[in-house]
């Protein structure tokens, strides 16, 4: 029950790890420990990095400083074509690079073509095999300049890329292509979309690919990186021996204007009208030139200021919503990289119906307020403290950085000459800059950004009559923004002086149980609540809290479902007690405190964490959240208005409408599974929200809470009895029982073909099985191997051999609670005329697996990675990790069983014991007597319209 809460509480701050690395730089003398870099006479740059953290494995990368932007008008799409061809025949791998990798159980490889560059990677290569690692170097060497580009490979990849083009087709690509001219001001970036046009993909010639490859894939535009558990000296010798064979020929100099985007003084304007637009909205986009080789202090400040902006600026919209003054359904703003040397600030808004112009004025008013007044010292300093704590936590983390992090540092060094520095030194440099910053610094930076230069305004709608904000209306609003300044203002926030200003009667601990294995205690309170407490000084001044109960949607009677849905959506949207959300946000500033509620299908939960110094604030806030939850009538009315608006404007044509029909076919509407339509939303009763909240959170006796961290027992008892013990609770009420939420149709077989308008000729196929048989641990493992085996076989046959699809997805799910259930689904896209053939092959390959007609190599390729992962999970666990102990306490709360960290980590390997017979048996078991679904969505054929590509 606690699993989702635990994940929220104790997740590794990877965003911090990624963010705090890449724009922080240090002097050249602080080069990373374990790094060897150099440059060969032919111009190839190399990086070898071993910091000792990636034991037993290495990652191999090629970075090619050529992307779609380098293509001329007769080459658009060829950079991406080359990426595909790279996994086919090369000088030293005539049977294909992909075949070689997969034959050696190397299944984690990738390539990415962007507008500015192309990247290749082979991951998790075992370093104990010296010959295999040398062969990885030869693969990189061939990618540099040894791809064969054979006619048969070109035609194979042409078919696959056309399927990829169709796979990506849809309103999102139409939107991206349509707005590119205003976002990029008609520069080269506006016309280079990486994949190219369908016409060009059908017609390009082998010689064109060769010419592009020979021209641009040269050592002076490439670097390789080997990162992991490798010997620096030996690897460097091997690199020199292998890569000296590359031709010593330079790629032509790149005209700096290729990547230049000209300024536009006046705003650019575009209306994007498409019947598949999901909601009427508008966006304001502003482009900035941010040089990658700017002075170090400028780069560090840009990075830190961007993090501040992306955290604090969106809160202005939240404050308007909290004050009930918003003219929008949704609004957001962000600052992020656009293309090389450019950033973009994006303001996007979905207005309430009939309030389009007011919403625009409000967005511009918020923008002007940030420009003219900036952030307050209070909000800046609170965020500064959080950012500082985050950086310090990252410095203390083990395994600082990942191979991909290191690759990005090498990229900066290669492109801009920025010294590659030790991760910890870089973060320390960031901290030095952060502590010196004041609110005036970021406000001056914002004022310099929020000009009217390089703007683009775009409206999005289904029809020309919708969202009809003209260019003149936008420009008029932009000029009149000072007059609309009050639209960005919220009412003065009255500070909270004492969160709980009334007496509460503390509870008592009426029973205490020693949990010896867990070294914890279980307290039963007089209101029936149970609290499992563990002292963990390794939490270093923090504590973690989680509470859960059987509940969620599964306990809601059909007649109350609408009220429940609304209550769930409006949790914490109207504040608590006598405080609104803006007051609470102000009160929370500077407090190292997090608290959230969750309502899942089968459970109700609460969770959070805080510094021990803020423990009283945390538990006082928890008490109000659980006992004084507010539901505002005005917030409720806007929720109903917003829901009805979104329902009325839902897509009624195209793929979205078809998907809605499919859902109703597979999961028919019933009282327990109602359609969320106009009648549903109009049936919601405002008074029902409080009743539903009380039903789920109003009886503390239904909950078991866990409290773990650096908080002494006496203090923990004081907090628990005062705040949790004072909650309403009645242990005499029976524990709640869930009902399975299975709304699938009872029909054993459903086969249906739908048709819809489509401009890409792409058909969708979904084949699935659903069964309700119990699986042992071994059978569950066999199911995972079966899924991987199927996906591999479908990839080999449907994509590589038959060229019927770009990708095939196979999913398998097994759940044991509240009832046993397993499902298997296969999803792919193909052209209309290939539907029958693709379906036939899907069933044929599945039948082959059930009959054990697959090779031992295919079995091992699917099983071995899972077996290796299983061995890795058996590594010793960190007994100081709060998430480990929360998980163990959760096991006890749910089962009554006490497990030690050693016992929880101990497990008998399963995957390595599996046989091909086990895979065939489980495939047969889950599909025999299962409910089967075969859903096909085909494009409509119009006379004279070509659909078979």
Could you say what each language-model-derived stretch is?
Residues 13-24:
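Bacterial N-terminal signal peptides
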Residues 1-9:
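N-terminal secretory signal peptides that target proteins for export/translocation
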Residues 146-154, 437-441, 445, 630-636, ...:
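Peptidyl-prolyl cis-trans isomerase
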Residues 30-45, 231-299, 303, 310, ...:
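Proteolytic maturation boundary segments
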Residues 217, 697-698:
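Flexible, low-complexity linker/tail segments at the boundary of structured domains
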Residues 49, 54-71, 77-81, 96-142, ...:
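M16 family metallopeptidases and their MPP-like homologs
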Residues 158-166, 171-208, 212-221, 227, ...:
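Hydrophobic, small-residue-rich alpha-helical packing segments that form membrane-like cores
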């Amino acid at each position: 029950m606690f699993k989702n809460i635990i994940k929220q509480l104790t997740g590794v701050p990877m965003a911090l790890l990624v963010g705090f690395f890449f724009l922080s730089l240090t002097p050249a003398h602080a080069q990373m420990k374990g790094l060897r870099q150099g440059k060969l006479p032919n111009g190839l740059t190399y990086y070898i990095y071993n910091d000792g953290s990636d034991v037993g494995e290495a990652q191999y990368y090629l970075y090619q400083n050529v992307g779609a932007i380098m293509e001329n008008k007769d080459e658009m799409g060829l950079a991406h074509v080359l990426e595909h061809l790279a996994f086919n025949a090369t000088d030293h791998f005539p049977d294909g690079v992909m075949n070689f990798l997969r034959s050696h159980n190397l299944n984690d490889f990738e390539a990415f073509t962007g507008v500015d560059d192309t990247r290749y990677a082979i991951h998790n290569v075992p370093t104990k095999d010296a010959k295999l690692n040398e062969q990885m170097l030869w693969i990189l060497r061939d990618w540099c300049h040894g791809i064969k580009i054979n006619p048969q490979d070109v035609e194979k990849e042409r078919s696959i890329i056309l399927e990829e083009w169709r796979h990506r087709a849809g309103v999102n690509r139409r939107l991206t292509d349509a707005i590119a001219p205003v976002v990029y001001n008609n520069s080269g970036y506006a016309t280079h979309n990486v994949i190219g046009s369908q016409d060009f993909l059908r017609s390009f010639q082998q010689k064109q690919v060769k010419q592009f490859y020979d021209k641009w894939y040269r050592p002076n535009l490439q670097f390789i990186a080997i990162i992991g558990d490798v010997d620096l000296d030996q690897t460097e010798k091997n690199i020199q021996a292998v890569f000296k064979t590359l031709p010593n020929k330079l790629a032509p100099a790149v005209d700096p204007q290729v990547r230049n985007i000209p300024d536009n003084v006046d705003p650019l304007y575009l209306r994007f009208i498409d019947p598949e637009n999901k909601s009427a909205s508008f966006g304001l986009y502003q482009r900035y030139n941010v040089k990658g080789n700017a002075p170090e202090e400028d780069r560090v400040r840009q990075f830190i200021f961007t993090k501040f902006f992306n955290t604090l600026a969106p809160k202005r919209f939240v404050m308007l919503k909290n004050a009930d003054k918003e003219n929008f359904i949704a609004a957001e703003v962000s600052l992020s990289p656009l293309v090389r040397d450019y950033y973009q600030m994006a303001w996007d808004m979905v207005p309430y119906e009939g309030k389009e112009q007011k919403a625009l004025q409000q967005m511009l008013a918020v923008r002007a307020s940030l420009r003219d007044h900036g952030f307050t010292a209070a909000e800046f300093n609170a965020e500064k403290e959080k950012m500082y704590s985050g950086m310090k936590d990252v410095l203390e983390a083990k395994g600082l950085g990942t191979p991909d992090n290191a690759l990005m540092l090498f990229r900066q060094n290669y492109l801009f000459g920025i010294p590659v520095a030790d991760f910890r030194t870089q973060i320390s440099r960031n901290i030095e800059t952060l502590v010196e910053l004041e609110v005036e610094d970021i406000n001056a930076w914002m004022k310099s950004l929020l000009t009217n230069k390089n703007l683009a305004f775009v409206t999005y709608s289904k029809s020309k009559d919708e969202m009809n904000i003209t260019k003149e209306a936008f420009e008029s609003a932009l000029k009149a923004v000072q007059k609309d300044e009050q639209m960005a203002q919220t009412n003065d926030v009255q500070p909270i002086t004492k969160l709980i200003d009334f007496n509460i009667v503390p509870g008592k601990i009426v029973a205490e149980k020693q949990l010896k294995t867990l070294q914890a205690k279980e307290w039963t309170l007089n209101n029936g609540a149970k609290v499992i407490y563990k002292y963990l000084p390794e939490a270093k001044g923090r504590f973690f809290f989680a509470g859960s109960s059987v509940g969620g949607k599964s306990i809601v009677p059909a007649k109350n479902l609408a009220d429940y849905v609304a209550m769930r959506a409006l949790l914490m949207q109207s504040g608590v007690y006598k405080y609104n959300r803006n007051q609470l946000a102000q009160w929370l500033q500077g407090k190292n405190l997090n608290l959230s509620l969750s309502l899942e299908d089968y459970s109700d939960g609460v969770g959070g964490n805080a510094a021990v110094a803020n423990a009283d604030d945390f538990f006082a806030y928890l008490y109000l959240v659980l006992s004084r939850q507010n539901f505002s009538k005005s917030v409720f009315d806007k929720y109903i208005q917003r829901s009805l608006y979104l329902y009325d404007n839902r897509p009624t044509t195209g793929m979205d409408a078809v998907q809605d029909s499919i859902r109703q076919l597979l999961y028919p509407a019933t009282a327990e599974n109602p359609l969320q339509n106009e009648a549903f939303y109009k049936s919601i009763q405002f008074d029902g929200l409080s009743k539903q909240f009380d039903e789920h959170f109003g009886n503390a006796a239904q909950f078991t809470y866990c409290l773990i961290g650096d908080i002494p027992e006496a203090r923990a008892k004081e907090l628990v009895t005062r705040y949790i013990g004072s909650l309403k609770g009645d242990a005499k009420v029976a524990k709640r029982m869930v009902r399975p939420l299975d709304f699938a149709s009872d029909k054993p077989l459903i086969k249906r073909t739908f048709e819809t308008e489509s401009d890409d000729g792409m058909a969708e196929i979904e084949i699935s099985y659903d069964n309700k048989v119990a699986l042992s641990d071994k059978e569950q493992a066999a199911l995972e191997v079966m899924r991987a085996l199927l996906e591999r076989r479908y990839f080999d046959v449907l994509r590589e051999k038959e060229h019927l699809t770009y990708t095939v997805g196979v999913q398998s799910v097994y759940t044991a609670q509240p009832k046993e259930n397993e499902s298997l689904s296969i999803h792919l896209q193909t052209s209309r005329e290939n539907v029958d053939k693709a379906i036939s092959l899907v069933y044929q390959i599945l039948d082959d697996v059930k009959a054990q007609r697959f090779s031992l190599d295919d079995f091992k390729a699917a099983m071995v990675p899972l077996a290796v992962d299983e061995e890795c999970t058996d590594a010793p666990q960190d007994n100081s990790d709060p998430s480990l102990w929360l998980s163990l306490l959760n096991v006890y709360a749910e089962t009554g069983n006490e497990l030690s960290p050693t016992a929880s980590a101990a497990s008998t390997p399963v995957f390595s014991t599996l046989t091909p017979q086990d895979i065939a048996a489980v495939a047969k078991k889950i599909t025999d007597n299962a409910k089967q679904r075969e859903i096909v969505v085909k494009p409509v054929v119009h006379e004279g319209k070509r659909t078979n590509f």
